[in-house]
Amino acid sequence: DEGFNIIDNILDWAKPHKMYVILDLHAAPGGQGRNTDISDYDPDKPSLWESEQNKSKTVALWKKIAERYKDNDWIGGYDLLNEPNWELPGGVDLKDLYVRITNAIREVDDKHIIIIEGNDYANNFTGLTPPWDDNMVYSFHKYWNSTNADDLNWILPMREQHNVPLWMGESGENSNTWYTDAVTLFEANNVGWAWWAMKKIGSVNSPYRIRVNEGYQKILNYWKDGGDKPSEQDAYDAMMKLADNALSENCIYRKGISDALLRQPHTENTIPFKNTHQIPGVVFLSDYDLGKNNHAYYDNDIATYHQSSGSFTAWN
């Protein structure tokens, strides 16, 4: 029950803050995608799609989850598979598994939303329409591509045709300008959105940055370059320090990112980065105003759109 206990603790925290928790299966038995870094796929073992046993385990897992949380009002929904990416012609096998999971969930829980991601990292819904449940949402992800006014035209007709909500369930890994433009696009089309991730280790593009401690860096060096192997105790201490650094109060808060996501999509106004600047005095270059490019600051390289353009642009 260790995994369930973690979810229970999260729900206990979320309830007084009136925050919904969406359960998203990132590592299905065998792995739902070829990307080993996010789906735990092992090329030497059968994937989710190559093993009936793995499929049955996935169905049983979701039924067990639904049995436990069927009456919890702070579960926002069940996101059945995160970013499946496999050769699944016509989406037949993907839909078949989704329907099996949905049926298993509905045996014990007829209340919570079923969230369906497309193939190819949640962006290919071939074979996944029409919806097979009356309480279903289609969820796509968006990374590193353009944010023009017509960039959701590939998926908006699916919502209108089938009268089913859309949710942009994951995005991020870009610049503040891209964040503002993307949120503006979603909200102009009444598409809900969620960002990844709230906290990241050593990141410059998440609201909270987790500091890397010296011991953890030694572990990374050992894994990556074959550096000196840390002792078991040193490794344990480093990981516990990293866990402590991950507490919100110990993170570096990047309020410019929150501002780009929550305020800037709705205004051209700029606001001071700090309210304590005084002249005469020192104003650091990095403390430019919070606001959009060409308003709070001026920059030529403001985002990367390499999924659309085919070439990567370093924005930072």
Per-range role (PLM):
Residues 178-181, 185-278, 302:
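Aromatic-rich peripheral "rim/lid" segments of glycoside hydrolase catalytic domains that contact
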Residues 45-46, 140, 195, 280, ...:
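Generic secondary-structure boundary/loop-capping signal
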Residues 257-316:
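Extracytoplasmic
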